[in-house]
């Protein structure tokens, strides 16, 4: 697969699943299961529910994707509150 052979969409992380998987709701309302790209894992960029992300989706399987970037909020304010225990 070529480097530019993907569909790039914006979405919001709805749920964090085990094994660095995330359920992301795209702008058009579709849900995809997405994992973190290698650079985000390498630099330990945290993605939490409520974060706005850019997802690369393969044209061959539109239900799975790769989180390529976490975008910041335009206001620069605090991030959404986390639920659950913190490690």
UniProtKB/Swiss-Prot annotation:
Gene3D superfamilies per the record? Nucleic acid-binding proteins
Name the major location: cytoplasm
Q: Which residues form the S1-like domain?
A: 1-72
Quote the PROSITE patterns the UniProt record gives: S1_IF1_TYPE
**Keyword set includes RNA-binding:** yes
Query: Pfam families this protein is in?
Result: eIF-1a
The subcellular location is:
Cytoplasm
Molecular functions per Gene Ontology: ribosome binding; rRNA binding; translation initiation factor activity
Whether rRNA-binding counts among this entry's keywords is yes
Coiled-coil features, chain-numbered ranges: none
Superkingdom of the source species: Bacteria
Q: Which UniProt keywords apply?
A: Cytoplasm, Initiation factor, Protein biosynthesis, RNA-binding, rRNA-binding
For this record, the Gene Ontology CC terms, alphabetical, are: cytosol
In residue numbers, the region (Disordered) covers 65-87
Cite the InterPro entries for this sequence.
NA-bd_OB-fold, RNA-binding_domain_S1_IF1, TIF_IF1
Secretion signal: which residues? Answer: none
Q: State the family named in the UniProt similarity comment for this chain.
A: Belongs to the IF-1 family.
Q: What is this protein for, i.e. what is its function?
A: One of the essential components for the initiation of protein synthesis. Stabilizes the binding of IF-2 and IF-3 on the 30S subunit to which N-formylmethionyl-tRNA(fMet) subsequently binds. Helps modulate mRNA selection, yielding the 30S pre-initiation complex (PIC). Upon addition of the 50S ribosomal subunit IF-1, IF-2 and IF-3 are released leaving the mature 70S translation initiation complex.
On assembly, the entry states: Component of the 30S ribosomal translation pre-initiation complex which assembles on the 30S ribosome in the order IF-2 and IF-3, IF-1 and N-formylmethionyl-tRNA(fMet); mRNA recruitment can occur at any time during PIC assembly.
Quote the protein name from its UniProt record: Translation initiation factor IF-1 2
Q: Which organism is it from?
A: Nitratidesulfovibrio vulgaris (strain ATCC 29579 / DSM 644 / CCUG 34227 / NCIMB 8303 / VKM B-1760 / Hildenborough)
């Amino acid at each position: 697969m070529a480097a530019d052979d993907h569909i790039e969409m914006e979405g919001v992380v709805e749920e964090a699943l085990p094994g660095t998987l995330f359920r992301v709701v795209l702008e058009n309302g579709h849900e995809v299961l997405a994992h973190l790209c290698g650079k985000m894992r390498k630099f330990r960029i945290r993605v939490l529910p409520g974060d706005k992300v850019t997802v690369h989706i393969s044209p061959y399987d539109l239900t799975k994707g790769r989180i390529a970037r976490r975008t910041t909020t335009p206001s620069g304010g605090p991030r959404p509150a986390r639920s659950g225990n913190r490690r």
